């Protein structure tokens, strides 16, 4: 069959060697007419098709990507297509947030004897891609910089945590300290508005411990490096989810970790505070007054209500108290989770945009990216830093090309590696020195995972299995497409 109309488009197909490739061969032997746009890549199993293959193809200029494997229950490697089904469905729901039309990607199942079905699949998919036309390229998009509306109503009252019993926490840590090699918490950084990690090994170290609205760094990030040692960690509710997720994946041992939980009433977004303060030489003092924080800079007081200056993650937080803790200090904030999950500010902004606007949005922000990898280094779940794809040369995933495409590809790699694992702690975005809203990519995947897998949220249950590490023979919310 000739090209459907006009210019031949670039469509990439990843076909399972045992079934779908055989089905394509059966169609060819039967001389069934097929469009010629598809370029086939033969793979051992659909379970070996990393979602990054699909993203790399789409970002590099493919107009469409098709993945086809054996029917569920017929996999030659027992369960490869069961795992593929979950990964690829999450990917399909992730693509639109990048500005890529989800219809440019499809996956299906075709056996070696189904030559006629293969003809239907490739013809229908090629027709769909021709209707969409050539895929827009991020390099050609007009840069668009837009900020999220941070005035969205929070799910719960936000206060500065001024009543947090710090002395009680210090006493609890000192009591446990002889049994532990170290306890991780926060101390004042170079001024009162900046917290730094604190590694407490002596009672004198414990006296340096601070608690307040600027305790934003996630101490769970350091736990994997202490595996095999007895260690304590002081956590807010969001931090505790990271600890639970590390336990789920056996990246830390439960018997080795003592969790000190403190109730949290929200933390301030230091980037927005800095912007409001303008030029200043030094921050002299930070004080909490009810539901606001008063920052004294260069002798002048500035009042910051948490309802206006809280971090975006605090506005949709459903865990004001630690999910799991050995020692709980203070009374948790009374809170009833809402019946419907609120949309985070950055994700709400992207939801309001068209696909071309989203592509322009990422073009504008990726031009600002320094490729410093602070987002990776701050992430508590990014634990393969000894062999990260950013530096890997075998396989060679990324080049050192300073292009928006390579920068966005790194961010999508990070986001997809966190699929079903990201707890939404926001450290990636907080650590970004130029303030790129990269948390929205992780939030979109978390939303897709929650939709597909009965509201699953990472880091809430230590005995749960992350969805992409398992499968169901019959998936409740994933269904085969009709190609007729």
Predicted regions and their residues:
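Short cysteine clusters
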Residues: 16-19, 65, 70, 75, ...
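Ferredoxin-type iron-sulfur electron-transfer modules in oxidoreductases and energy-metabolism complexes
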Residues: 95-97, 338-367, 381-484
